[in-house]
C-alpha cells in the first residue's frame, strides 16, 4: 500500500511538473506584429522566364569603384533587382535615357532592353543584386 501511494505521488508530481513545463512554453506566433514592408521593385516572372529549371534565385553584393562600370548588356531571361546601399550608380539605357540611383533606392532590369551602369562619383557604389540566374 505504501509503495502504491508513493508511486501515485511520484506519478502526480511528474504530471504536474510536465504540465508546468508545457504550459510555460511559448508557442510560435502565426501573425505579423510591428512589421512594415515596402516593395521597392517587382518583376512579373511569368512574363520573363518559361521555367525555373536550371536557374537559381541569387542574392549578391557588388561594388563598383569610382570611374568603374559594367558594360552594355540586357536582362532577357535574367530578371534583376538592384538595391543601392551607398554611393551613386548611373544607369544608361539603349533608348538614350539615363537615371541616377542613390542609397536606399532600387531599380529593376528585365526584358530585351539593354543598359550599362557606371560610377561617376568619388565614392564606391555599393549595392545588393537579386536575380533569377542561369546556373
Language-model regions: role of each:
Residues 3-7, 12-58, 92, 100, ...:
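A short, N-terminal "cap"/entry segment at the start of jelly-roll beta-barrel domains
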Residues 49, 70-75, 93, 118-120:
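Short histidine-centered beta-strand/loop micro-motifs
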Residues 52-55, 68-80:
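A short beta-loop-beta micro-motif enriched in histidine and acidic residues
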Residues 59-61, 81, 106-108, 129:
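Conserved hydrophobic/aromatic beta-strand scaffold that supports enzyme active sites
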Residues 64-65, 95-112:
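Short acidic-glycine-tyrosine-enriched beta hairpin
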Residues 69-71, 90, 107, 111-118:
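Histidine-centered metal-chelating micro-motifs
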Residues 75-95, 105:
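Glycine- and acidic-residue-biased ligand/ion/polar-headgroup-sensing regions
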Residues 112-135:
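Ligand-binding loop in jelly-roll beta-barrel domains
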Amino acid at each position: 500500500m505504501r509503495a502504491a501511494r508513493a508511486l501515485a505521488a511520484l506519478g502526480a508530481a511528474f504530471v504536474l511538473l510536465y504540465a508546468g513545463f508545457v504550459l510555460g512554453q511559448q508557442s510560435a506566433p502565426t501573425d505579423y506584429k510591428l512589421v512594415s514592408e515596402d516593395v521597392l521593385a517587382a518583376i512579373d516572372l511569368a512574363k520573363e522566364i518559361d521555367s525555373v529549371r536550371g536557374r537559381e534565385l541569387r542574392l549578391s553584393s557588388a561594388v563598383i569603384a569610382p570611374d568603374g562600370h559594367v558594360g552594355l548588356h540586357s536582362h532577357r531571361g535574367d530578371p534583376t533587382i538592384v538595391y543601392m546601399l551607398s554611393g551613386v550608380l548611373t544607369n544608361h539605357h539603349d533608348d538614350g535615357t539615363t537615371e541616377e540611383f542613390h542609397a536606399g533606392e532600387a531599380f529593376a532590369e528585365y526584358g530585351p532592353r539593354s543598359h550599362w551602369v557606371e560610377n561617376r562619383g568619388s565614392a564606391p557604389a555599393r549595392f545588393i543584386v537579386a536575380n533569377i540566374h542561369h546556373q
